[in-house]
Design a protein with these regions (language model features):
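Polar, low-complexity loop segments and adjacent catalytic/binding residues used for recognizing
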Residues: 2-295
Length: 295
């Protein structure tokens, strides 16, 4: 009897240890934040939630290498693949409102990124041009298993940036596989150039069709509340080799010599379904200056 009890206790402790090591997985594949609380997100670095319940990614300070970084992730991992032989990535979509505040007549550094990653831990990453996601040592490493859509406000010619205000798609590093200057399309399909650090709110939509292996990225100023019919980036891309079965979604920001602040004001996400609508009429307040504050 004592031997059976000992075996049961050993088995029970093994199960508990296995559960403790396993990442928390959300049973819900859809979420909506029209404002934020600290408990909503896994925050690290300079990322914080302000008194007005905006997500602030950086503190407006500057630094030399490795720079300043801020990371913010949804607290639980999401299932991006069904446990079948095909291992095909599911469809997913996200929508968010952001604003970047830089010094007048000077682009801040370096921008922010929406990311899908196997872990929310980026303690070894560098700020600046690496967005708080990568470092000189691992940039471009296929073992990173990271999908990135970057909103970049500094041109780095050595990273093949097309200009100082662009949107790009990165896989496992910060060398874009596709990028376009920041712009949106009006109702009559007229292309309007934009500036990402305009200090005014901008909407972004990122949509991935798993069966079709199609990625679409669209942006528009808040004054243009409906999603434009024309996308900014539309690319055929298979994310199945990149994404694991369970991944984390979130944002990352990096700055170095140049100063800027980035705010995420609202965010929604959906897996295999329509992304929830944001309440654009009640967005959190944010500081429109680098050194003034509503936090």
């Amino acid at each position: 009897m004592a031997l059976q009890l000992s075996r049961f206790l050993i088995f029970f402790l093994y199960i508990l240890a296995h559960i403790a090591r396993s990442p928390a997985t959300s049973p819900n594949s859809t979420f909506l934040f029209n404002s934020f609380r600290q408990s909503d997100l896994n925050l690290s670095g300079s990322a914080t939630v302000t008194r007005t319940r905006a997500l602030q990614m950086t503190n407006g300070q500057h630094s030399m290498e490795p720079g300043i970084k801020g990371n913010a992730f949804f607290t639980a991992s999401l299932q991006f693949k069904k446990p079948t032989a095909s291992k095909r990535t599911k469809s997913f979509s996200t929508r968010f409102v952001f604003t970047i505040v830089s010094k007048a007549h000077q682009s801040g550094g370096h921008g922010f990124a929406f990311i899908v990653a196997p872990s929310p831990n980026f303690s070894n990453a560098m700020g600046g041009r690496f967005f708080g996601l990568f470092s000189i040592r691992n940039n471009g490493n296929t073992r990173n298993q990271i999908f990135v859509v970057e909103f970049d406000i500094v041109q780095q010619t050595n990273l093949h940036d097309i200009d100082e205000s662009h949107v790009g798609v990165d896989i496992n590093g910060v060398n874009p596989s596709a990028s376009e200057p920041a712009a949106y399309y009006t109702g009559n399909r007229k292309k309007e150039q934009g500036v990402l650090d305009s200090q005014t709110p901008i909407q972004a939509w990122i949509e991935y069709d798993g069966p079709m292996k199609q990625l679409n990225v669209t942006i528009a100023p808040l004054s243009h509340q409906l999603k434009p019919n024309c996308t900014l980036i539309s690319r055929s891309i298979d994310l199945s080799p990149v994404l694991l079965e369970h991944m984390y979604v979130g944002f990352s920001f990096g700055t170095q010599k140049l100063v800027s602040k980035c705010y995420i004001l609202a965010w929604s996400f959906a897996m295999d379904g329509k992304v929830p609508e944001l309440d654009l009429s009640h967005l959190p307040l944010y500081s429109s200056g680098l050194y003034s504050s509503v936090e």
